[in-house]
């Protein structure tokens, strides 16, 4: 019998449960019995281990000889493999053995990983049950249509065919807030009063249901049927939630999805059930008939998913799929609100229903409009899921990474790498030692010295470019450079040996960054010394100038001219020094490296083998996609090749961490060193042997021009030939590839910052501009800023006057003919400490506020003592919090103000805000000294009070001065061209404000008369 497993589950008992769908898309529960989880103990004595575990029942110990994954820790080492009845016993036993002085390994590997590794089973995919599988007819554990009990030896990998469809329920809750203008916070009156659901069953039409409290304005059933949904009304919140639970129990979905369904809907539903004393009813909506799901709280962050913190239910047989973190990972949007996302990806718009409308609907019992809005929101989630093929992508990624699909939401990248490494090691005689188990020591003893260096290492090589516009540039990239280096040079935990070992390759180099051997650091110190001398000279000149009587005009002018020359030199040196400091960064490295790894012919490493399998798997998937005749296979193969690619590129990152599952900085620094060598060698060969000029080199890419190529076709063929010739110099699979595009115009501003126009071999161009690292690529700029930058860059690349396009845009800005969306700036808020938590901690324990450093904590403490007259206590901490918050970025201060107004701002939220205009002081003839942070407000707040507020157009223009002037100067335009325009506008605005003040209140304006000389 073949089944498609979509979830493995182990609660620590003596059986592992697999939830699967058959070819008819019905849910099947497979109860795998007889499997004994275990771990390795580093000792040669089975008796010593069994004596230490004499209080445990049914312990099995077997002596095995294995290699450590970390080769420096030994090979052919005696271990004892210890197995237990269940995972509960295994975890307790590992603690007992560690306290007894034994080193235990692979304690991280949970039973599901051990079983799927031992039997080569997919974590998401087809399995086959042997003839020994017994169908359970009575006293079933689950509510599945069919249930089987099978010994673990009777389960094997199934055929690789397209997966069946699954039953999906998409959800969206509408919740009241008893506090006006504040988000719901599970207060008594913050009731769930509406739940929209769409049920998607394979082969059937979608069923749309709206569960709602009783309302006065729902139309007749026939009208609702024309809209495409039915309404079920309930007298109170308890019965509504009970109805929702009954629906989930009857439908038995394999997937529950929604937009922010983990971050809000399920979390909030659970809180309301706890408040109403009915949490068990919700917890029993999974596939387990008698075992209620347990509440879990997760908190983690990654560069892909950002900060993740939520509570969820560990349902058996039901996978919660949240669309929000997936879209955050795959798309860089200004905003992740559902209306913006669907408009961008689907071209669909949400109904213009606000939070106030929702709260009003609850209060007035006029719920029809909000109900239709709720169902449409759920439909948008369904459309997003189908368009992005989210479920197929998750299952393919889970299969490649050897983890459950839900683990992709609840844990970061390292568990995926660990699972793949574990599976390979288990089959090939390695024991996975990692810092959390192999290095654990008994209580009272000092931990052993770490194998890994504490110092940093130098990263990828970037060639400092000469800013300017270049014609006909071709990009030549190394394909999967770091994975290819790991394969070619056999860089792995398992191949690290002492230098000079027969059959090994030795790498030796020096890393110098920000140390006395770094030429840039030497130059930085020289500039600092010169600036010190110039400061002394400037002080002397000022004293000399002040000592000269004003009547001696010529003598005084001579000294002033000399002083101005010194000040100009200072400014130039400070600019140069600042650029150097930016290059040097804060990291300091000063080391001589000497590392060796076994050659592939001697012994192929674990990581190179895994990477080879991943890259080969990707090639097979891409080939299968090209040959596929049906859309399902095409989609599956596309998602699979993407999963292989992401997983392969993540292997290097797992080694480079200082702390984690499998840190190995020796390997990471060797890979980056050889990567730098590859870039430099390729650039040298391209220049010396093929007549190419290197414009820019970055990590794994070279941007080159060839003067002898006169047409796009010649340049194209030349690039292909050069890439092939250079690739032959490097060991496979390292290869340089032409990216199949010509940059007809390439404007480079600095490292990782460039703009281009491209064409194909025939010279055909779409005219669309590409870019990287410039203002347009950053989401924390307003739409107007990006629009102004874009039209300026486009004009420069097309050799047109940028002011022809820029002037109308500036006119629209100043005359307020732009939409509010153009003025909105978005920025992500990290984690920061709320006031109540801050006050509870002591002043001495304060180092940072969540993710944010405090610029001058001592100054804030001194001011607090001055204000409160105390050195501690709640009042002191409350004042200190306000002063510390004033040192944080403006958008964080805005988030804190929003919380003070009763709004909810979760960590990782992207705030949408605008900059408001400061008030003008007519008496002092200047704008009041409001800081920028005080003038930030959310776009929603501005909409509500737009008649009393005004946007600060000058601020938006000011943010363009440096970027546009750099762009214009790089393209050969006059210096400070846009700065002059901005200065004119500032002066014009001051004159206008003075005139307004004079008309309104003439006595407040100081009239200065100038006498004729």
Swiss-Prot record:
It is an enzyme of class 2 (transferase). GO terms for biological process: DNA-templated DNA replication; viral DNA genome replication. It catalyses: DNA(n) + a 2'-deoxyribonucleoside 5'-triphosphate = DNA(n+1) + diphosphate. SMART domains: POLBc. InterPro entries: DNA-dir_DNA_pol_B, DNA-dir_DNA_pol_B_exonuc, DNA-dir_DNA_pol_B_multi_dom, DNA/RNA_pol_sf, DNA_pol_B_thumb, DNA_pol_palm_dom_sf, DNA_pol_type-B, RNaseH-like_sf. One of its GO terms (molecular function) is DNA-directed DNA polymerase activity. Keywords: DNA replication, DNA-binding, DNA-directed DNA polymerase, Nucleotidyltransferase, Transferase, Viral DNA replication. Its EC number is 2.7.7.7. Disulfide bonds: none annotated. It holds the Pfam family DNA_pol_B_exo1. Signal peptide: none annotated. It comes from the Viruses. DNA-directed DNA polymerase involved in viral DNA replication. Belongs to the DNA polymerase type-B family. PANTHER family: DNA POLYMERASE CATALYTIC SUBUNIT, DNA POLYMERASE DELTA CATALYTIC SUBUNIT. This is Putative DNA polymerase 060R.
């Amino acid at each position: 019998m073949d089944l498609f497993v979509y979830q493995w589950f182990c609660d620590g008992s003596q059986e592992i449960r697999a939830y699967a769908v058959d070819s008819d898309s019905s849910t099947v529960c497979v109860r795998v019995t007889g499997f004994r989880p275990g771990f390795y103990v580093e000792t040669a004595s089975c008796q010593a281990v069994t004596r230490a575990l004499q209080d445990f029942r049914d312990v099995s110990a077997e002596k095995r000889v294995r290699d450590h994954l970390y080769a420096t820790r030994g090979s052919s080492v005696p271990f004892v493999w210890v197995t237990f009845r269940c995972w509960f016993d295994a975890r307790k036993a590992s603690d007992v053995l560690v306290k007894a002085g034994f080193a235990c390994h692979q304690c991280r590997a949970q039973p599901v990983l051990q079983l799927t590794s031992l039997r080569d089973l997919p974590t998401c995919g087809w399995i086959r049950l042997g003839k020994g599988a017994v169908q359970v007819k009575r006293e079933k554990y689950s509510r599945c249509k069919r249930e089987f009990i099978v010994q673990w030896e009777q389960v094997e990998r199934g055929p690789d065919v397209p997966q069946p469809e699954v039953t999906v329920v998409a959800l969206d809750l509408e919740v009241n807030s008893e506090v006006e203008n504040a988000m719901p916070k599970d207060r008594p009156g913050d009731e769930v009063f509406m739940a929209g659901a769409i049920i998607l069953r394979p082969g059937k039409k979608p069923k749309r249901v709206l569960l709602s409290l009783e309302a006065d304005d729902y139309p007749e059933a026939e009208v609702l049927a024309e809209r495409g949904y039915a309404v079920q009304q309930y007298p109170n919140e308890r019965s509504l939630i009970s109805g929702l639970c009954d629906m989930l129990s009857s439908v038995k979905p394999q997937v529950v999805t929604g937009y922010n369904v983990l971050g809000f809907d399920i979390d909030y539903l659970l809180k309301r059930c706890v408040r109403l004393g009915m949490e068990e009813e919700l917890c029993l909506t999974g596939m387990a008939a008698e075992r209620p799901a347990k509440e879990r709280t997760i908190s983690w962050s990654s560069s892909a998913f950002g900060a993740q913190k939520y509570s969820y239910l560990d349902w058996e047989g039901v996978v919660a799929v949240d669309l929000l973190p997936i879209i955050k990972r795959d798309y860089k949007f200004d905003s992740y609100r559902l209306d913006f996302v669907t408009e961008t990806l689907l071209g669909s718009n949400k109904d213009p229903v606000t939070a106030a409308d929702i709260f009003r609907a609850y209060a007035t019992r006029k719920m029809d409009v909000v109900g239709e809005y709720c169902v449409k929101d759920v439909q948008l989630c369904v459309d997003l899921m189908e368009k992005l093929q989210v479920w197929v992508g998750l299952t393919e990624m889970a299969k490649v990474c050897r983890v459950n699909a839900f683990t992709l939401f609840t844990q970061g990248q390292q568990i995926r790498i660990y699972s793949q490494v574990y599976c390979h090691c288990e089959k090939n005689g390695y024991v996975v030692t990692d810092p959390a188990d192999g290095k654990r020591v008994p209580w009272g003893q000092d931990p052993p010295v770490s194998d890994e260096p504490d110092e940093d290492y130098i990263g990828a090589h970037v060639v400092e470019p000469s800013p300017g516009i270049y014609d006909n540039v071709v990009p030549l990239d190394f394909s999967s450079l770091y994975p290819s280096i790991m394969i070619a040079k056999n860089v792995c935990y398992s191949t690290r040996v002492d230098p000079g070992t027969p059959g090994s390759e030795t790498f030796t180099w020096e890393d110098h960054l920000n140390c006395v051997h770094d030429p840039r650091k030497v130059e930085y110190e020289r500039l600092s010394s010169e600036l010190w001398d110039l400061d002394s000279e400037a002080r002397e000149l000022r004293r000399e100038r002040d000592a000269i009587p004003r009547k001696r005009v010529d003598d005084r002018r001579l000294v002033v001219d000399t002083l101005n020359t010194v000040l100009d030199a200072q400014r130039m040196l400070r600019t140069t020094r600042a650029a150097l400091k930016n290059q040097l960064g804060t990291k300091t490295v000063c080391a001589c490296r000497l590392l060796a790894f076994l050659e592939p012919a001697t012994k192929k490493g674990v990581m190179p083998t895994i990477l080879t399998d991943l890259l080969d798997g990707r090639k097979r998937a891409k080939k299968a996609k090209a040959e596929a005749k049906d859309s399902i296979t095409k989609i599956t193969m596309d998602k699979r090749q993407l999963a292989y690619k992401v997983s392969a590129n993540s292997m290097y990152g797992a080694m480079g961490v200082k702390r984690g599952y499998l840190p190995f900085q020796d390997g990471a620094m060797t890979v980056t060193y050889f990567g730098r060598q590859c870039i430099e060698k390729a650039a040298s060969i391209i220049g010396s042997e093929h007549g190419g000029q290197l414009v820019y080199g970055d990590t794994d890419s070279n941007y080159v021009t060839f003067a002898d190529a006169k047409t796009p076709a010649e340049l194209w063929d030349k690039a292909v030939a050069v890439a092939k010739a250079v690739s032959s110099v490097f060991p496979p699979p390292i290869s340089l590839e032409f990216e199949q595009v010509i940059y007809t115009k390439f404007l480079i501003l600095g490292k990782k910052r460039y703009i281009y126009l491209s064409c194909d071999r025939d010279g055909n161009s779409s005219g669309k501009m590409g870019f990287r690292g410039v203002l347009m690529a950053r989401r924390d700029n307003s739409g107007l800023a990006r629009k102004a930058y874009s039209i300026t860059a486009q004009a420069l690349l097309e050799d047109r006057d940028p002011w022809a396009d820029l002037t109308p845009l500036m006119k629209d800005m100043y005359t307020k003919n732009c939409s509010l969306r153009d003025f909105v700036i978005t920025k992500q808020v990290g984690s920061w400490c709320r006031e109540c938590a801050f006050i509870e901690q002591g002043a001495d324990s304060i180092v940072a506020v969540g993710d944010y450093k405090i610029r001058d904590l001592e100054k804030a403490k001194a001011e607090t003592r001055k204000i409160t007259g105390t050195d501690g206590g709640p009042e002191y901490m409350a004042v200190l919090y306000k002063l510390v918050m004033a040192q944080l970025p403006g958008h964080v201060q805005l988030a804190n103000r929003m919380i003070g107004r009763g709004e909810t701002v979760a960590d990782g939220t992207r705030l949408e805000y605008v900059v408001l205009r400061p008030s003008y002081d007519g008496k002092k003839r200047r704008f009041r000294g409001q800081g920028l942070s005080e003038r930030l407000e959310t776009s929603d707040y501005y909409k509500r009070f737009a008649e009393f507020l005004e946007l600060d157009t000058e601020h938006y223009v000011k943010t363009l001065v440096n970027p546009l002037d750099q762009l214009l100067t790089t393209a050969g335009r006059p210096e400070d061209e846009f700065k002059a325009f901005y200065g004119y506008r500032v002066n014009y605005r001051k004159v206008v404000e003075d005139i307004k003040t004079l008309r309104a209140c003439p006595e407040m304006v100081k009239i200065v008369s100038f006498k004729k000389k």
